[in-house]
Regions:
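Structural signature of the two symmetry-related core transmembrane helices
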Residues: 82-96, 187, 289-304, 384
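Cytoplasmic helix-loop-helix junction between adjacent transmembrane helices
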Residues: 110-151, 335
Length: 399
């Protein structure tokens, strides 16, 4: 069948556009804060890297428990929208509490609440997105959604950068007052996102599981290819620590807080421009090829982070890091939809996202310890090795 990607946007289900707009607004809010949190912890509160890794790991791993059961619950109810909106709302409610943060434990509590909200919404949202797209549009739909997500991150970073420039001018490290102003500004797009999703998204019919045929969390329930893919993703994720360490590496190599914002905007611009086209490409040439290319680029970029000597090198490498994200993020979710029946997708996405989240705790803790007790290059070498191993297993196991 001849592919005509230029005509696809006009034929996409309206849900895909509303979910994309909601994610865009959410990321405007979230990215104003998320990438400043490690700098707030390190520069303002004086927290060590091992604790920063622990905070990121605990937040993601705790949310993983919610991801499993929210996905299973959405399968049992045959309804996705309610859980999706509830998750976005909880994350919105948690954000203002960062304004009062004075200890790392306080930050952990807010991060925990925010990630629980993400855990509630992610699996049913992905199932809703998959159910709203035709099979031959699925990669494109996920790519468009991720592109909107990342475009929101780009604008959010731009707003954060403007606030930093206006409030602390030439000061190179983040200050408390600046962070508090960013927190207040982030609330507006978060509230708008919840309204867009609540009013715009419509439920998509899905087969409701009967009481004697409820989706289970047992491993053997799923196809061998899905199980193999999850195992390979876990191996990769163990070396894919929080991006907080890349941000700190940039500062370690001389980038100011405004330059770090610029670096992050470069990453998001690259990702936003490529996510849609590469998602569409995966519909034609296959998901595994793009995943392998993405993980290979990741390994080379992480090796570059380890060997870099200047902030400019970190900035350039972070642009290539955006290519890795565009090649893998939406494509991985489309691959899950390809190999799992529709009535199990909520549960499958819950397990898939949970596997990543559970791996995030040891990944970030290991990275923090390697940074603190060996050297700042060590976590990146570790990540590069595991990414290349995962790429090999993707080719040999997931067939």
């Amino acid at each position: 069948m001849t592919s005509q990607p230029q005509s696809r946007p006009s034929r996409l289900h309206p849900n895909i556009w509303f979910l994309t707009i909601g994610s865009l607004l959410t990321d405007v809010s979230s990215e104003m804060l998320t990438n400043l949190i490690p700098l707030f912890l390190y520069n303002v509160l004086g927290v060590q890297t091992s604790i920063i890794g622990l905070i990121d790991g605990i937040a993601e791993t705790t949310a993983s428990l919610v991801k499993i059961y929210s996905g299973a619950l959405s399968d049992r109810l045959g309804k996705r929208k309610m859980l999706t909106v509830a998750g976005y709302a909880l994350s919105t409610i948690s954000k203002p509490f960062l304004y009062m943060a004075v200890t790392w434990e306080w930050v952990l509590g807010v991060r925990f609440s925010d990630r629980v909200g993400k855990g509630i919404r992610t699996a049913p949202r992905d199932a809703l997105l998959a159910g709203s797209a035709k099979t031959d549009q699925r990669g494109f739909a996920f790519g468009i959604h991720r592109a909107g997500d990342t475009a929101g991150a780009f604008f959010g970073l731009g707003i954060a950068g403007l606030i930093i420039w206006l409030t602390q001018a030439g000061v190179t490290v983040l200050e408390r007052h600046t962070f508090q102003v960013v927190v207040l500004a982030s609330i507006i797009p978060a509230v708008l996102a919840v309204l867009v999703l609540a009013l715009g998204v419509k439920e998509v019919d899905a087969e409701r599981q009967s009481n004697h045929n409820l989706p289970t969390l047992r491993w053997k329930t799923f196809d061998r290819r899905f199980r193999a893919f999850v195992i390979v993703v876990i191996i990769f994720t163990l070396g894919n620590s929080s991006d907080s360490f890349i941000i700190l590496r940039g500062q370690n190599r001389g980038l100011s807080v405004l330059q770090i914002i610029g670096m992050l905007m470069t990453f998001n611009a690259v990702y936003a421009l490529l996510a849609g086209p590469l998602g569409s490409l995966s519909d034609r040439i296959g998901r595994r090829k793009l995943m392998l290319a993405g993980w290979t680029i990741y390994g080379l970029v992480y090796l570059g982070f380890a060997l870099s000597h200047t902030g400019a090198e970190i900035w350039m490498l972070f642009g290539f890091y955006g290519i890795y994200y565009a090649l893998t993020e939406g494509v991985a979710k489309a691959l899950v939809a390809d190999i799992v029946p529709q009535e199990q997708r909520g549960t499958a996405y819950g397990l898939f996202n949970a596997a990543i989240g559970f791996s995030a705790l040891p990944a970030s803790v290991i990275a923090g310890v390697l940074w603190q007790y060996i050297n700042p290059a060590a976590p990146f070498i570790f990540g590069a090795v595991l990414s290349l191993l995962a790429g090999f297993l993707l080719v040999t196991w997931v067939r």
